[in-house]
Regions:
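Pre-Walker A (pre-P-loop) alpha-helix and adjacent loop at the N terminus of AAA/AAA+ ATPase modules
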Residues: 53-96, 415-420
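Conserved alpha-helical scaffold flanking the Walker A/P-loop in AAA+ ATPase domains
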Residues: 81-85, 144-182, 224-231
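Walker A/P-loop
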Residues: 85-136, 200
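Conserved C-terminal "switch" segment of AAA+ ATPases
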Residues: 117-123, 248-254, 261-323, 421-430, ...
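Conserved AAA+/SF3 P-loop NTPase catalytic/coupling segment centered on the Walker-B
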Residues: 138-148, 170-204, 248-257
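Conserved catalytic/switch belt of AAA+ P-loop NTPases
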Residues: 152, 156, 194-233
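Conserved C-terminal helix/linker of AAA+ ATPases
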Residues: 309-310, 315-340, 344, 503
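Peripheral, non-AAA+ core regions of ATP-driven protein-machinery
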Residues: 369, 375-556
Length: 556
């Protein structure tokens, strides 16, 4: 056999082997494709069957507010929200308020309200993108960021076409999805600081710039739209609406300075009852007045009231009833281990050493503050004991921290100094000032109330139980301005007070719109005593002390 024949045989053998190899590959691909198609059809059929199954509409969706009128008790907050977003120049907004008062519902409705305004820049197809800051986690390497967006570099893309070609692939985030609309971030106070800083840059530029080590302007293999994204950025012209249960001081100043702040207040009992009544009507259930009052007694916000109605309605439906019994609500309250709310009211009769102070906790939420004082003559040197207040507080930043005596504790010292000028010598008494309620009190606004209580306890003078008061006191007996006056006046009225004493510097014309309570501005502690003590010779005693003070001042 010649060498030519041998070469042909070898070539034939190799040709057969190569042919068998490619035939085997094609067969495997065909088998794999058939298997994938079969699996795909199976999954599609499963999805189709699942989509054919649907439950009835949950009660929670039935009672969800569909108009601003369904949001109870937040008229001022909604008015501010509309002013910020429904005009020709909408602004970024942060909504503060306790849970379950309608912050999220108002944010969902405000865009539809803005679309109805012909002067609004929002279009009919403007989107509302919702994001929960507690779950908006991101990768510090920039692989994934649901808020800002990210770039999938080829090393992370796997077997994709762009990955094999070495092309970075941009992925847009929620800020781009919300372009031309509203981006709502629930619990914005929980947002990671890095994401917060990135978003501040987006709010300024109104676009998102992405970076990648794999991107090159000279690379002609990269598609044109990716070049455009890296060079011009992703559009992100939206309006931010954030909601938080935190106080304004806990939100970074950088984001606060760029947003209009709107405050939603805590619902009172009557408003919670109204929410419960509306919820019962939406689920087509009848409920008695006793049941409504019971819900108002136990529910602390609108969401809790709706939950009580839903569970009670479920019990009634299971028993084929169209009305909710009081027993249903009692059972739900008992099984949920709810405790009734304690709403403080003024004491029914005047007492010695009992003063109605006022406090504020949370945005636009005030409360009556009972202040109890006893004064017992001491055998030797007396003492002053204060309970129920914050003794010490810490202030500072990340780099340094300062600890100091609390403002409430400092206010007690001011009170004792002023009372010494009125011949009330604390050294001769064992004085106990108590703030009951279990919540530590801080701040200087209870100064005039503590002074009134101590003077009453020492001189055995009755305090008018229908008067509430708030104000800081200086060591010269002057009443200084404080914060949260509007909320405190509303709380005094709700507690049954007929008069409320406030610092004169806090008096504003809009406070006269509060009906049902007399607002009395004062400048001196003497005025507070004249308005508070129920004793005929009180004026004479104060005039004597005032005359002595003026004589001493002239001699100096």
């Amino acid at each position: 056999m010649s060498w030519t024949n041998i070469f042909l045989v070898v070539q034939l053998v190799f040709g057969v082997i190569v042919g068998l190899y490619f035939w085997h590959l094609l067969r495997n691909q065909r088998t794999q494709k058939v298997s994938i198609d079969r699996e795909s059809k199976k999954e599609l059929e499963q999805l189709r069957k699942m989509r054919e199954i649907s439950l009835t509409e949950p009660l929670a969706e039935k009672v969800r507010p569909t108009t601003f009128l369904d949001i109870v008790g937040q008229e001022d907050g909604i008015k501010s929200l509309k002013a910020a977003l429904c005009g020709p120049n909408p602004q970024h907004v942060i909504i503060y308020g306790p849970p379950g008062v309608g912050k999220t519902a108002a944010a969902r409705l405000v865009l539809e309200e803005a679309k109805r305004n012909p002067k609004s820049p929002f279009r009919t197809n403007s989107t509302f993108i919702e994001l929960d800051a507690t779950t908006a986690r991101f990768d510090e390497r920039g692989i994934a960021d649901p808020l800002i967006g990210s770039v999938h570099d080829p090393i992370y893309q796997g077997a994709g076409a762009m990955g094999q070609a070495g092309i970075p692939q941009p992925k847009k985030g929620a800020v781009t999805d919300a372009h031309g609309g509203i981006l709502f971030i629930d619990e914005i106070g929980e947002l990671h600081p890095i994401q917060m800083n990135k978003m501040l840059k987006v709010l300024e530029d109104r676009k998102v710039f992405l970076e990648s080590a794999y991107y090159s302007e000279e690379n002609t293999m990269i598609p044109t739209y990716i070049h455009d994204i890296f060079q011009k950025g992703l559009p992100a012209d939206f309006r931010l609406v954030g909601a938080t249960t935190r106080s304004p001081e806990e939100i970074p100043p950088a984001i606060r300075s760029r947003c209009l702040e709107v405050f939603f207040r805590e619902l009172d009992t009557e408003e919670i009852q109204k929410v419960a009544k509306n919820a019962a009507e939406k689920v087509e259930m009848q409920i008695g007045e006793n049941g409504i009052e019971m819900i108002g007694m136990y529910a602390r916000n609108g969401r809790e009231a709706i939950n009580l109605v839903q569970i009670s309605a479920g019990m009634a439906i299971n028993e084929e009833r169209s009305f909710i019994k009081d027993e249903d609500i009692e059972w739900v309250v008992h099984s949920s281990q709810l405790t009734p709310k304690y709403e403080k009211r003024i004491y029914p009769i005047p007492r010695i050493g009992l003063v109605n102070g006022l406090a504020v906790y949370g945005p636009n939420t005030g409360a009556l503050l009972e202040i109890e004082v006893t004064a017992i003559k001491a055998k030797d040197k007396g003492s002053v004991n204060v309970t129920g207040i914050v003794e010490e507080e810490s202030i500072g930043s990340q780099t340094k921290s300062i600890r100091r005596k609390s403002m409430a504790k400092g206010s007690v010292d001011n009170v004792l100094t002023v009372l010494r000028s009125l011949d009330v010598l604390p050294e001769g008494y064992d004085i106990h000032i108590n703030f009951p309620g279990g919540i530590p009190i801080d701040g200087p606004s209870a100064g005039i109330a503590m002074a009134t209580g101590v003077y009453s306890a020492v001189h055995r003078t009755y305090v008018n139980n229908e008067v509430a008061m708030t104000g800081e006191i200086s060591i010269h007996g002057e009443v200084k301005p404080i914060g949260g006056v509007y909320a405190k006046i509303k709380a005094a009225k709700k507690a049954g007070a007929k008069k409320v004493i406030i610092p004169a510097e806090n008096m504003q014309p809009f406070l006269y719109t509060i009906k049902g309570i007399e607002i009395i501005p004062v400048r001196k502690l003497k005025e507070v005593f004249e308005l508070t003590f129920m004793q005929e010779n009180m004026h004479r005693e104060l005039d004597v002390h005032t005359h002595v003070d003026e004589t001493d001042a002239q001699s100096m």
